[in-house]
Swiss-Prot record:
Encoding gene, per UniProt annotation: rbcL
Major location (coarse): plastid
Name this polypeptide is given: Ribulose bisphosphate carboxylase large chain
Self-association and partners: Heterohexadecamer of 8 large chains and 8 small chains; disulfide-linked. The disulfide link is formed within the large subunit homodimers.
Subcellular location: Plastid, Chloroplast
Record lineage: Eukaryota, Viridiplantae, Streptophyta, Embryophyta, Tracheophyta
Database matches in Pfam families: RuBisCO_large, RuBisCO_large_N
Domain of life per record: Eukaryota
Further remarks about this protein from its record: The basic functional RuBisCO is composed of a large chain homodimer in a 'head-to-tail' conformation. In form I RuBisCO this homodimer is arranged in a barrel-like tetramer with the small subunits forming a tetrameric 'cap' on each end of the 'barrel'.
Magnesium in keyword set: yes
Length: 480
């Protein structure tokens, strides 16, 4: 027998394959305050017990592999392994479970969303023993949160920078999203800001294409911002999309935006990646820029109920990585978003502390300690008739963005902006007077339209426009 063989035998190594549940299913385990907790929606293959499936998820997303390895004896599995500590059947489903997994904090690099996701939502999602797997929620411990900077500035600092309080902020995505020259693009920005909007926005796929290079767009938009500010006396901004093919190019664009003196830049955080996003967030805090986040590609990840990752997890990840705004659906517009679920992750973005709330799909109590909040952005297929519902659903700490609902106005861009500003001010005043926006919303808009011809014209154009399709992702309680 060789010395190597003798060493393996002396530590009790036994080659072969054993059930995951023997090592990674630990129902007696009490999670530590420092553990990262995950709630997975697990759909096992037929014949795979729920305990084995949950344990497999814990193993393959932490220290485990498909067979016993002798190097297990060179470390402490009890210290580093993930543990499936609780399993609940999903109501209304025959073979689907919520499996709760606890991960020791030492498994993750400090301040790195990239590393956290590489482990928790890595290769395990292609595991053959599972028909489907979805990460529903994470509990991020305070000890890990404190290793992140988080949003560059947060809600209160943004309001102070803009000197705007007591109402949602108003925005607009410039349309058509692709094809305009930089000068015509800047003209549209100016008209919308002059009409009463707080922000205008690059669409997510506006980067630096042949028809409009980024530097030209930045210059014309900055000119539009300063001209609109001079005419209105209000602070204005345009989300200049700094997303680029490399991190170096992205930062170069952000540097140029800062040199122009504009207040805010933008990033597509999922297509750009968490490493790039965190780098940009650090630059924005150091240089006084607000950071608007678009979630392009999110529905590829989060829309299917049984597989992928819920947006509430992506929202938590963004708050760690850094962003002052993030798109969060509208509930009433053209994009997917069930009301209770949307309000659940809106709370996660804005509040310092959220409790477990099954009615909103929140699986864990979450403390954000001193991490600044993020403004949710409602955007996508909304117009003036939606204003009462949006004001009631999202409240003051939000951004309401009307792209087609501004630039589609029959009289032009500036009247479209006027219509939205009048509608918003009317809804905020009515709410402050104690009126019920949900019940009286249409009446409030009609009353305001009597003295605003711009709003009256908008009401006429969009009076029949609705997007009434059932949400794909709904709460499990709906099946009971």
């Amino acid at each position: 027998m060789s010395p190597q063989t003798e060493t393996k035998a002396s530590v009790g190594f036994k080659a072969g394959v054993k059930d995951y549940k023997l090592t990674y299913y630990t129902p007696e385990y009490v999670p530590l305050d420092t553990d990262i907790l995950a709630a997975f929606r697990v759909t096992p293959q037929p014949g795979v017990p729920s305990e084995e499936a949950g344990a497999a998820v814990a193993a393959e997303s932490s220290t485990g592999t498909w067979t016993t390895v002798w190097t297990d004896g060179l470390t402490s599995l009890d210290r580093y392994k993930g543990r499936c500590y609780h399993i609940d059947p999903v109501p209304g489903e025959e073979n689907q479970y919520i499996c709760y997994v606890a991960y020791p904090l030492d498994l993750f690099e400090e301040g790195s969303v990239t590393n956290m996701f590489t482990s928790i939502v890595g290769n395990v999602f292609g595991f053959k023993a599972l028909r489907a797997l979805r990460l529903e929620d994470l509990r991020i411990p305070v000890a890990y949160i404190k290793t992140f900077q988080g949003p560059p500035h947060g809600i209160q600092v943004e309001r102070d920078k803009l000197n705007k309080y007591g109402r949602p902020l108003l925005g607009c995505t410039i349309k058509p999203k692709l094809g305009l020259s930089a000068k015509n693009y800047g003209r549209a920005v100016y008209e919308c800001l002059r009409g009463g909007l707080d922000f205008t926005k690059d669409d997510e796929n506006v980067n630096s294409q042949p028809f409009m290079r980024w530097r030209d767009r930045f210059l014309f938009c900055a000119e539009a911002i300063y001209k609109a500010q001079a005419e209105t006396g209000e602070i204005k901004g345009h989300y200049l999309n700094a997303t680029a093919g490399t991190c170096e190019e992205m930062i170069k664009r952000a540097v140029f935006a800062r040199e122009l003196g504009v207040p805010i830049v933008m990033h597509d955080y999922l297509t750009g990646g968490f490493t790039a996003n965190t780098s940009l967030a650090h630059y924005c805090r150091d240089n006084g820029l607000l950071l608007h986040i678009h979630r392009a590609m999110h529905a590829v990840i989060d829309r299917q109920k049984n597989h992928g990752m819920h947006f509430r997890v992506l929202a938590k990840a963004l708050r760690l990585s850094g962003g002052d705004h993030i798109h969060a659906g509208t509930v009433v517009g053209k994009l997917e978003g069930e009301r209770d679920i949307t309000l659940g992750f809106v709370d996660l973005l804005r509040d310092d502390y959220t409790e477990i709330d099954a009615d909103r799909g929140i699986y864990f109590t979450q403390s954000w300690v001193s991490t600044p909040g993020v403004l949710p952005v409602a955007s996508g297929g909304i117009h003036v008739w939606h204003m009462p519902a949006l004001t009631e659903i999202f409240g003051d700490d939000s951004v309401l963005q009307f792209g087609g609902g501004t630039l589609g106005h029959p009289w032009g861009n500036a009247p479209g902006a006027v219509a939205n500003r009048v509608a918003l001010e009317a809804c905020v005043q009515a709410r402050n007077e104690g009126r019920d926006l949900a019940r009286e919303g249409a009446t409030i808009i009609r009353e305001a339209a009597k003295w605003s011809p711009e709003l009256a014209a908008a009401c006429e154009v969009w009076k029949e426009i609705k997007f009434e399709f059932p949400a794909v992702d709904v709460l499990d309680k709906a099946k009971k």
